[in-house]
């Protein structure tokens, strides 16, 4: 809305809708975190309880359990996959609308200006979501703590 119809932004995005979107995002994040934490807490941990990672994340913690963590891995992939795919779908749909709006601009200079503005945003979104996706969307059989540590450093440096 902000790019396609900038003058209509305050009408089509009232403060109440923005608040609902923020509340929904926070609620989804809390629900995901609580589910992962509640499913991880009853698992027994044995041996050296030193996490070989920079962050106390779910995947490194699952590597320390003595029991079968397949249910937790399934929950992790399901929740993170659903969240990631929903966000990706929303982003792709919004970029399609933006692309259609940009292509309807008559002047070449205006199209170039709009594309250059959107290109930096697209690069930022890509640099934000690709490392997060690589870190959280690996199935347990392909999961590598070393690869996730590299991804975590890359993500931390970018963000």
UniProtKB/Swiss-Prot annotation:
PROSITE patterns given in the database record: G_PROTEIN_RECEP_F1_2
Any one GO molecular-function label of the UniProt entry: odorant binding
Transmembrane segments: 17-41, 83-103, 117-137, 149-159
Chief location of this protein within or outside the cell: membrane
Pfam family for this entry, one: 7tm_4
Residues bearing glycans: 80
Similarity remark: Belongs to the G-protein coupled receptor 1 family.
Protein name per its UniProtKB record: Olfactory receptor-like protein COR8
Protein species of origin: Gallus gallus
Name of the gene: COR8
């Amino acid at each position: 809305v902000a790019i396609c119809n900038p003058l209509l932004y305050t009408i089509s995005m009232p403060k109440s809708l923005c608040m609902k979107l923020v509340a929904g995002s926070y609620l989804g994040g809390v629900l995901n975190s609580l589910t992962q934490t509640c499913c991880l807490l009853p698992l027994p941990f044995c041996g050296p309880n030193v996490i070989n990672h920079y962050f106390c994340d779910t995947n490194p913690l699952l590597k320390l359990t003595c029991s079968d963590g397949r249910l937790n891995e399934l929950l992790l992939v399901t929740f993170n996959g659903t969240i990631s795919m929903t966000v990706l779908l929303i982003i792709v749909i919004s970029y399609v609308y933006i692309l259609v709006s940009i292509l309807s601009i008559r002047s070449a200079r205006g199209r170039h200006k709009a594309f250059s503005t959107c290109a930096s945003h697209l690069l930022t979104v890509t640099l934000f979501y690709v490392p997060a996706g690589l870190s959280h969307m690996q199935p347990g059989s392909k999961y590598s703590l070393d690869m996730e540590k590299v991804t975590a450093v890359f993500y931390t440096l970018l963000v």
